[in-house]
Amino acid sequence: MEALAAEVGRVFGCAIETGTVIEDLSFALDQNRQQYHSTLILDQLAANTPQHFLKTLAIAQVDLFIPILTHVYGEAQLGGTACVVSTFRLNESRSGLNIAPRYIERIVKEAIHELGHTFNLRHCPDHTCIMHYCRNEEDVDRKSDELCRYCKIMLEDEIKRLKT
């Protein structure tokens, strides 16, 4: 968590607090799919976020989905306050016994990506930009951990807007 907080703070230029917002995710479990509906988690996050938080990122170790996709690495409220990232599919070893060499790096990239959406950043066509949409772990590995020039400008503009 410390590495994640440091990287998020570096990209967004803000102080980071860590803690638990939601303990039990069973309310979002779809029994038929044996996956967790990420939109339901977002709704709870937004409702339970402390007032003094600008944004809230949840890191979940469960398999997330939205109804139109088989799985998602994360989901965010575009321009909102909440986002969630799943670590479940970012590790080649689902057993948790063998951690993929790039596991932490993938979590950091997806966390920054989802937080970017909360700052109104859309998916970017630049394959190296952290805001590029990823279909699989290889896509996550291929993109950098940085915003492209265009997305960086958009983020700076959004942060300025939020400060006024």
Which positions does each model-derived feature cover?
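The catalytic-center signature of Zn2+-dependent metalloproteases
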Residues: 93-163
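Metzincin-family zinc-dependent endopeptidase catalytic domain
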Residues: 1-111, 122
